[in-house]
């Protein structure tokens, strides 16, 4: 569905719809991604009691309007959306950048629960990734999946040719793949490229530099008073190289140990790498 806000037409995907739900759950995507991550997170066991939504932030997916360049601006966008939907005390599940947005919202209004998934704070982004994101989105995706994915599920394709899940989108020349988003070389391990395609396709956006904007927003974000967080849980990947768990971080100071989950043999994208385990945890 689409909801008119002051400066945006917000796209919100409804996973289900019930009257008088116990909770309203919002899945907030990470940098460069959109509502499609919701299709990889099985929340169906909650459909009888709760409404589940996945949303697109401006510049992502189907939401139109001016691009937002800071976590605070994206937080305000979500607050406006919640008010327009007449929803109070939401449950927010934020992945990576989405976790920072959930954190910022939870410091500004009451949330029933905020789940920060693969979100470190502060979330600093290396200069190499920032440069890739600005000039070559495919190279940024390569970096994200190379260092972010530990457990690669096998993807079965129905034909021998690469691109059966998006034929025509790519052009190939001596192992180099060219797309509207940049270039990459898959000569070393073409099977891995096929296996990670279901994840990489989530980064394809009409705004080619949206990943760059998002990553800069993550690096720049500083919460007003991290000691005031409440009703917050954390999910980390044991093998995550992009957002590592730091037990001494102040963000965990007021969180009980039972509300911090470390997923074994999982990197930065648990909804892709270990979806069944993630579903049970959530």
Where do the protein language model's features map onto the residues?
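Post-His helix in hydrolase/transferase enzymes
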Residues: 256, 272-282
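N-terminal cap/lid segment of alpha/beta-hydrolase-fold proteins
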Residues: 1-9
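Conserved alpha/beta-hydrolase catalytic His-Asp/Glu region
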Residues: 131-227
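Conserved loop-alpha-helix segment in the C-terminal half of the alpha/beta-hydrolase fold
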Residues: 43-44, 231-266
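Conserved alpha/beta-hydrolase "nucleophile elbow" surrounding the catalytic nucleophile
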Residues: 29-31, 90, 94-96, 237
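Active-site loop/oxyanion-hole signature of alpha/beta-hydrolase fold enzymes
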Residues: 8, 51-93, 97, 280
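Conserved hydrolase catalytic core segment
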Residues: 88-125
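Conserved HGGG/HGGXW glycine-rich cap/lid loop of the alpha/beta-hydrolase fold
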Residues: 8-64
């Amino acid at each position: 569905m689409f909801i008119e806000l002051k400066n945006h037409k917000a796209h919100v995907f409804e996973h289900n719809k019930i009257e008088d739900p116990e909770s309203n759950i919002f899945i907030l995507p990470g940098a460069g991604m959109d509502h499609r991550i919701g299709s990889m997170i099985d929340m169906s066991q909650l459909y009888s009691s709760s409404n589940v939504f996945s949303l697109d932030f401006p510049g992502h997916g189907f939401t139109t309007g001016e691009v937002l360049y800071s976590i605070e601006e994206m937080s305000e966008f979500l607050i406006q959306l919640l008010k327009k939907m007449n929803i109070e005390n939401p449950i927010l599940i934020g992945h990576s950048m989405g976790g920072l947005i959930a954190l910022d919202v939870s410091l500004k209004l009451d949330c029933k629960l905020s789940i920060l998934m693969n979100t470190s704070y502060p979330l600093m982004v290396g200069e190499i990734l920032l440069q890739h994101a600005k000039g070559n989105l495919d190279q940024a995706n390569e970096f994200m999946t190379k260092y972010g994915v530990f457990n690669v599920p096998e993807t079965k394709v129905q034909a021998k040719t690469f691109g059966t899940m998006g034929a025509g989108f790519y052009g190939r020349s001596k192992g180099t793949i060219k797309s509207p988003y940049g270039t990459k070389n898959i000569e070393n391990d073409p099977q891995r490229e096929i296996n990670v395609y279901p994840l990489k396709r989530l980064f394809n956006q009409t705004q080619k530099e949206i990943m760059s904007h998002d990553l800069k927003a993550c690096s720049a974000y500083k919460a007003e008073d991290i000691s005031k967080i409440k009703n917050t849980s954390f999910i980390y990947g044991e093998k995550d190289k992009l957002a590592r768990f730091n037990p001494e971080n102040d963000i965990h100071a007021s969180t009980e140990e039972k509300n911090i989950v470390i997923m074994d043999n999982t990197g930065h994208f648990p909804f892709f790498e270990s979806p069944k385990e993630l579903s049970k945890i959530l």
